[in-house]
Amino acid sequence: MRKFRNLLISAITISSVLLPLEITKAQEKIEVIPLIQSTKGLGGEKISYPRWKQAELRFFKVIIPVGAKTPTHTHPAPMVVLLAKGELKHTRGDVINYFSSKQSFIESNNGDEHFVENIGNEPAILYVVAASAVGLPTTVNK
């Protein structure tokens, strides 16, 4: 009987400590923080969506080695780019933009040809979400 009483007291003590922790966790609020929102791309071009095919969302991780440069290209669908790590130089004609870790930008599907170069001393890691369509390429190299 004594063992049972000790076990019962232990169970009540443990649950009285842990139960408030669970209630506290449930009372914490979920926070939604907008990171980027625009109706235009990096070069000021309006964003539009492909209407001729089934919509398709794409999510990529892109790794650009130190000193590497992408081919000159365009995008037929709008995209959001987050530079998670590294430093980039984004060149569109005479317009040059520089980005560092934790910065983001939007590419319009109506934008001009451009290229991106890793100007940092570590591989650049980008996360890209494209609002595209089935069968539509993400990038068109020139």
Give residue ranges: language-model regions.
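Membrane-topology and secretion signals of cell-surface/extracellular proteins
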Residues: 30-35, 52, 70, 90, ...
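Short structured motifs
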Residues: 43-47, 100, 113-114
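Short proline/glycine- and basic residue-enriched helix-capping loop/turn segments at helix->loop/beta transitions
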Residues: 56-63
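Short acidic-glycine-tyrosine-enriched beta hairpin
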Residues: 64, 93-111
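Ligand-binding loop in jelly-roll beta-barrel domains
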Residues: 110-135
